[in-house]
């Protein structure tokens, strides 16, 4: 279906199918911080598999979080229950870019190991890998946490467009490397999530955000898997 071919029925999966709605998820996550669970290959695989076993969905979605790439890159970020991602030192200046190094070959080894374990258990059920889009991840780094109106992010776009572009460029490279690690480990498709991009007017999106999302897709195009972009 993702390759636009005829199928007997539309495939069914849920965006957040692995998570708090499942009692088995709550059991294995008890006492384990979110990002620790994401970076534990065996636990990430188990959580990914849970909704497939329970509901028989047509695809698994790898258990991760959009801030995992920056966590692996060394950014001090935690996921606070009831709040979301919280960044200890928000990004505000050119010097902050040094805290986002270029991806290295082993940066996402734990994620790749989790994907391989998952794929080995899934059989014919495909696995969808994902990453956060550069803009949405940048909004957490700039705001320091969730923000509906994104005042600091919008201010950086308007007042310091070169800094904003440099930040999104680095995040695009991290997202692409994160996706490549998942695909090369066996993911059958990928999705890029831009869950805060709807806060921007269309002009700012086209000028300052879209090129960086396109950069992510360009860096995984050679792998030949279906690619999905989700933005609200």
Regions found by a protein language model. Give the residues of each.
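A charged helix-plus-loop insertion that forms the helical arch/lid used to bind
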Residues: 78-92, 147-154
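Short glycine-enriched loops at secondary-structure junctions
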Residues: 15-20, 65-67, 82-83, 131-147
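Active-site loop segments of alpha/beta catalytic cores
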Residues: 107-232
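Short, conserved acidic/polar surface loops in the N-terminal third of protein domains
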Residues: 71-76, 90, 138-143
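A gly/proline- and charged-residue-enriched helix-loop-helix capping module
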Residues: 82-121, 125
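Short glycine/proline- and acidic residue-enriched helix-loop micro-motifs
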Residues: 30-34, 93-103, 157-164
């Amino acid at each position: 279906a993702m390759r636009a071919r005829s199928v007997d029925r539309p495939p069914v999966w849920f965006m957040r199918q692995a998570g708090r709605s499942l009692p088995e998820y709550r059991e294995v996550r008890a006492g384990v911080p979110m990002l620790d669970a994401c970076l534990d290959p065996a636990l990430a695989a188990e959580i990914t598999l849970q909704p497939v076993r329970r509901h028989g969905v047509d695809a698994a979605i790898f258990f991760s979080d959009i801030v995992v790439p920056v966590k692996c890159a060394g950014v001090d970020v935690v996921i606070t229950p009831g709040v979301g991602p919280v960044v200890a030192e928000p990004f505000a200046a050119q010097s902050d870019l040094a805290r986002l190094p270029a991806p290295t070959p082993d940066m996402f080894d734990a994620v790749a190991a989790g994907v391989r374990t998952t794929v080995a258990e899934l059989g014919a059920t495909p696995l969808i890998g994902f990453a956060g889009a550069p803009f949405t991840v940048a909004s957490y780094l700039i705001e320091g946490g969730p923000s509906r109106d994104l005042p600091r992010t919008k201010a950086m776009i308007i007042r310091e467009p070169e800094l904003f572009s440099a930040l999104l460029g680095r995040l695009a490279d991290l997202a692409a490397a994160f996706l490549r690690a998942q695909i090369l480990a066996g993911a059958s498709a990928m999705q890029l999530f831009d869950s805060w991009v709807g806060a921007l007017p269309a002009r700012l999106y086209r000028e300052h955000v879209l090129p960086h999302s396109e950069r992510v897709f360009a860096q995984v195009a050679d792998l030949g898997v279906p690619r999905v972009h989700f933005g609200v």
